Amino acid sequence: MELVFIRHGLSEWNALNLFTGWRDVNLSEKGVEEAKEAGRKLKAAGFEFDIAFTSVLTRAIKTCNLVLEESNQLWVPQIKTWRLNERHYGGLQGLNKAEAAAEHGDEQVRIWRRSYDVLPPVLDPKDPNSAHNDRRYAHLPADVVPDCENLKVTLERVLPFWEDQIAPAIKAGKRVLVAAHGNSLRALAKHIEGISDADIMDLEIPTGQPLVYTLDDNLKVVSKRYL
């Protein structure tokens, strides 16, 4: 069985070196081309999908659409869920990473970005950019909508969707595409690859590159490769 992950193409804020998180920014021109190229690679390699899962953030949705369009599979059903959203970077969202490092120190920012269980500064729920004020999350209980997350909390958010939707689809023989974000995919990779809390700090998933897992019947990773 094979499973394909793709991190969204380079976003406008990626290009500006800003913390993005749950802020809904668009793909950059380069990101659009990355997503299209990913679709072409998947088509050339003969990948066909039965279902696609993505987040409720524009950059991932557009990446999913472009990948499917370029591979002549735009008709494939898509399920969008907040559980596949990027990690919520709290009060860091919208800040320039270099400026944050200058203020707080390189090591502190590295820990906020890459550690498994250290939380970033909290975003005030009354902030105009808080997810509490975004109607795409209006159906969720207020205490479920995050104000900041680390990778541990992100995994706790993502894992129920893996267990309830993605894993059963794979076990049913469906060919699955997951178009999401650097940290939601890192969380899933940690789970399916059995990566330790320490080693996950070093895992980087590049934008717009299809990551193909070969899984056994128990959804354990046999191999992985980038196209």
From Swiss-Prot:
Alphabetized CDD domains for the sequence = HP_PGM_like
State the SUPFAM superfamilies in the record.
Phosphoglycerate mutase-like
Tell me which residues this entry annotates as catalytic.
8, 86
**Catalytic reaction equation(s):** (2R)-2-phosphoglycerate = (2R)-3-phosphoglycerate
Marked site, Transition state stabilizer, at 181
GO annotation, biological process: gluconeogenesis; glycolytic process
This protein's pathway reads: Carbohydrate degradation; glycolysis; pyruvate from D-glyceraldehyde 3-phosphate: step 3/5
Question: What is the protein named?
Answer: 2,3-bisphosphoglycerate-dependent phosphoglycerate mutase
Say which species the protein is native to.
Answer: Mannheimia succiniciproducens (strain KCTC 0769BP / MBEL55E)
What gene makes this protein? gpmA
